[in-house]
Amino acid sequence: MPGYVTNPASAPARESWYAEPAKVFDNLYFVGGQVHSAWALTTSEGIILIDTIFPYNSEELIVGGMQKVGLDPKNIKYVLISHAHSDHIGGAEMLQARYRAHVVMGGPDWDSVAKYPNRYKTMAPKRDIVATDGMKVTLGTTSVTIWLTPGHTPGTLSYTFTVLDRGRPVNVAYSGGTAFNFVNNTPDPGIKNFQIYIDSQQKMAERAAATRATVLLANHSEFDNAVNKNRMLAGRGSGAHPYEIGADWVQRHFQVTQGCARAAQLRLEQKAVETTKR
């Protein structure tokens, strides 16, 4: 799916990306698509939006989706961008300009937006808040803690925060970059890049454990199965929340990402050894 579409008429067919918005927790709403996520965290003083999808569908999915579930997008106060790829930063410029929302992003990714104006045409918010490790974005009594987790991009951010399920506090770990979207096919710099990724995944495993996170969210609905879980919510009744997988399974996610990265890193290390023998 293309990240940047100059002509909206050439955007992918709506049926390939549209998903219904949903109230997932008392104070957290899904306003994303079939593959890419966006989340609206409501507070007593406004809304914290996490990720903004593509330029061509952020209007319908985020603005329209929020309105559909009874939220006013004018109340967006902060927009957190997990990383500066077009499937997450796509609507940030529009939301910043229209609602005067503060945009929070990792420093290296802010630098990328400034360095490549053509790449980020229509999705280049004005440089605003540069995230730092452990920074808290707070509205009212609700806070999102930001963690620097480079790897997917140099400025990737992940988060921990608390939501409410029928009044019961539930802790969330949010992964800001899962795939190996970096130079990974040559020993240099692939081995180093994988180590950066592994270290960040270990860091988030530790943060998730420290906060006793029992929910794992991602900025891709294909990774946390958001769309299917949203359907399950409709028939939940008095049963368990489909998003609450338990602390052990949250840890397993980060173990798997580290293990996959280490396996790929080992292949590059072997490739480097074979190259030196020639």
For every predicted segment, state its role.
Residues 1-15, 166, 180-278:
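Accessory terminal helices/loops
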Residues 18, 34, 52-55, 59, ...:
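Solvent-exposed, acidic/flexible segments
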Residues 50-52, 77-84, 103-106, 148-151, ...:
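Active-site neighborhood of phospho(di)ester-bond hydrolases with catalytic His/Asp-centered motifs
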Residues 25, 42-43, 58, 63-69, ...:
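Helix-coil boundary/capping segments in enzymes
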Residues 5-8, 23-25, 71, 75, ...:
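Metallo-beta-lactamase
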Residues 14-69, 73, 158-181:
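Conserved beta-strand hairpin/beta-sheet module of binuclear metal-dependent hydrolase folds
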Residues 57, 84-90, 110-113, 154-157, ...:
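Active-site environment of divalent metal-dependent phosphoester hydrolases
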Residues 28, 57-60, 64-136, 231, ...:
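Active-site HxH/HxHxD metal-binding segment of metal-dependent hydrolases
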